[in-house]
């Protein structure tokens, strides 16, 4: 089959925006699906890749989908910049029936399968469309039938209709944040987007992952105020920086007691999510209320 734009299901209006519903044929029904969001540069790809490894070490069959045009979500797993779905399709003039799975799926560390959706050139096209077509291509090649866990690593904190598209496929959305004003402010906007999407889709907030932070006091205070919970805490350790330079996951680095505490935390997070994290019924703050709420007296 060729990949083509299908007629969208009826359009709904949600709080002043147009939302196109998910085609029921494109639902991911055979795996637990997590979408990882957070402020740009907060460490979503690091978190996603190490979480994927943790799931794989639980014996799960894992697929990680990078949803950033930079296509750098999975390089610590694959040790290279994987070809994107868009690159693969362009190579066959968008005749998807000519593609083989190995043209766009790369097996990474500990058997984690990796896909980089890629995206249109900067300032053109819709990244969300690319994500949707990636899922369709995976289904056409029956690659989701042998998968237990799908992890979407989503671009920055963009919550437009395009890059909110992984929420249409996800069971749980996870938010990566640091213990600072900018990260929590971005988290609140993501909570608002997920709150809106959950009215029409099955996605629910799974919780918050504290990253690159010595403490979690501001995160915990915000969580208590809006109805979120912290699932894990990963401090800002130099081994994280070194693992990225080495193009490796934390599970591949030279073991130390400090590093073991981090990998154990990832394993605990994977176990919690696999067991089924209860949804958080969070209600976002108004921007001005949050501005007054955060910080010290």
UniProtKB/Swiss-Prot annotation:
<protein>
    <recommendedName>
        <fullName>Light-independent protochlorophyllide reductase iron-sulfur ATP-binding protein</fullName>
        <ecNumber>1.3.7.7</ecNumber>
    </recommendedName>
</protein>
<dbReference type="GO" id="GO:0046872">
    <property type="term" value="F:metal ion binding"/>
</dbReference>
<dbReference type="GO" id="GO:0016730">
    <property type="term" value="F:oxidoreductase activity, acting on iron-sulfur proteins as donors"/>
</dbReference>
<feature type="binding site">
    <location>
        <position position="45"/>
    </location>
    <ligand>
        <name>Mg(2+)</name>
    </ligand>
</feature>
<keyword id="KW-0149">Chlorophyll biosynthesis</keyword>
<dbReference type="InterPro" id="IPR027417">
    <property type="entry name" value="P-loop_NTPase"/>
</dbReference>
<keyword id="KW-0479">Metal-binding</keyword>
<keyword id="KW-0602">Photosynthesis</keyword>
<dbReference type="InterPro" id="IPR000392">
    <property type="entry name" value="NifH/frxC"/>
</dbReference>
<keyword id="KW-0460">Magnesium</keyword>
<comment type="pathway">
    <text>Porphyrin-containing compound metabolism; bacteriochlorophyll biosynthesis (light-independent).</text>
</comment>
<keyword id="KW-0067">ATP-binding</keyword>
<keyword id="KW-0411">Iron-sulfur</keyword>
<dbReference type="InterPro" id="IPR030655">
    <property type="entry name" value="NifH/chlL_CS"/>
</dbReference>
<keyword id="KW-0547">Nucleotide-binding</keyword>
<keyword id="KW-0004">4Fe-4S</keyword>
<keyword id="KW-0077">Bacteriochlorophyll biosynthesis</keyword>
<comment type="similarity">
    <text>Belongs to the NifH/BchL/ChlL family.</text>
</comment>
<keyword id="KW-0560">Oxidoreductase</keyword>
<dbReference type="GO" id="GO:0051539">
    <property type="term" value="F:4 iron, 4 sulfur cluster binding"/>
</dbReference>
<feature type="binding site">
    <location>
        <begin position="41"/>
        <end position="46"/>
    </location>
    <ligand>
        <name>ATP</name>
    </ligand>
</feature>
<dbReference type="InterPro" id="IPR005971">
    <property type="entry name" value="Protochlorophyllide_ATP-bd"/>
</dbReference>
<dbReference type="GO" id="GO:0019685">
    <property type="term" value="P:photosynthesis, dark reaction"/>
</dbReference>
<keyword id="KW-0408">Iron</keyword>
<feature type="binding site">
    <location>
        <position position="70"/>
    </location>
    <ligand>
        <name>ATP</name>
    </ligand>
</feature>
<dbReference type="Pfam" id="PF00142">
    <property type="entry name" value="Fer4_NifH"/>
</dbReference>
<dbReference type="GO" id="GO:0016636">
    <property type="term" value="F:oxidoreductase activity, acting on the CH-CH group of donors, iron-sulfur protein as acceptor"/>
</dbReference>
<comment type="subunit">
    <text>Homodimer. Protochlorophyllide reductase is composed of three subunits; BchL, BchN and BchB.</text>
</comment>
<feature type="binding site">
    <location>
        <begin position="211"/>
        <end position="212"/>
    </location>
    <ligand>
        <name>ATP</name>
    </ligand>
</feature>
<dbReference type="GO" id="GO:0005524">
    <property type="term" value="F:ATP binding"/>
</dbReference>
<comment type="function">
    <text>Component of the dark-operative protochlorophyllide reductase (DPOR) that uses Mg-ATP and reduced ferredoxin to reduce ring D of protochlorophyllide (Pchlide) to form chlorophyllide a (Chlide). This reaction is light-independent. The L component serves as a unique electron donor to the NB-component of the complex, and binds Mg-ATP.</text>
</comment>
<feature type="binding site">
    <location>
        <position position="160"/>
    </location>
    <ligand>
        <name>[4Fe-4S] cluster</name>
    </ligand>
</feature>
<feature type="binding site">
    <location>
        <begin position="235"/>
        <end position="237"/>
    </location>
    <ligand>
        <name>ATP</name>
    </ligand>
</feature>
<feature type="binding site">
    <location>
        <position position="126"/>
    </location>
    <ligand>
        <name>[4Fe-4S] cluster</name>
    </ligand>
</feature>
<dbReference type="GO" id="GO:0036070">
    <property type="term" value="P:light-independent bacteriochlorophyll biosynthetic process"/>
</dbReference>
């Amino acid at each position: 089959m060729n990949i083509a734009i299908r007629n969208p299901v009826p359009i709904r209006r949600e709080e002043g925006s147009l939302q196109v519903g998910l085609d029921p044929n494109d639902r991911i029904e055979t795996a637990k699906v997590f979408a990882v969001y957070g402020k740009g540069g907060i460490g979503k790809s690091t978190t996603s890749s190490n979480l994927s490894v943790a799931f794989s070490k639980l014996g799960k069959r894992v697929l990680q989908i990078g949803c950033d045009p930079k296509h750098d979500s999975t390089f610590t797993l694959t040790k290279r910049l994987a070809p994107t779905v868009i690159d693969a399709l362009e190579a066959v003039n968008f005749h998807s029936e000519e593609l083989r799975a190995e043209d766009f799926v790369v097996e990474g560390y500990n058997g984690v399968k990796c896909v980089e959706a890629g995206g249109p050139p900067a300032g053109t096209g819709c990244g969300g469309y690319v994500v949707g077509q990636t899922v369709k291509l995976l289904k056409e090649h029956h690659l989701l039938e042998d998968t237990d866990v799908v992890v979407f690593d989503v671009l920055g904190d963009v919550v437009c209709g395009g890059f909110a598209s992984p929420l249409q496929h996800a069971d749980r959305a996870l938010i990566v944040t640091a213990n600072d004003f900018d990260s929590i402010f971005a988290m609140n906007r993501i909570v608002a987007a997920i709150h809106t999407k959950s009215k029409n889709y099955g996605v629910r907030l799974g919780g918050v992952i504290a990253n690159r932070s010595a403490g979690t006091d501001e995160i915990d205070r915000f969580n208590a105020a809006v109805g979120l919970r912290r699932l894990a805490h990963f401090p800002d350790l130099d081994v994280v920086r070194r693992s990225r330079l080495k193009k490796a996951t934390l599970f591949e680095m030279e073991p130390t007691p400090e590093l073991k505490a981090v990998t154990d935390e990832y394993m605990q997070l994977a176990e919690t999510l696999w067991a089924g994290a209860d949804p958080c019924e969070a209600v976002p703050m108004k921007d001005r209320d949050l501005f007054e709420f955060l910080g010290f007296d």
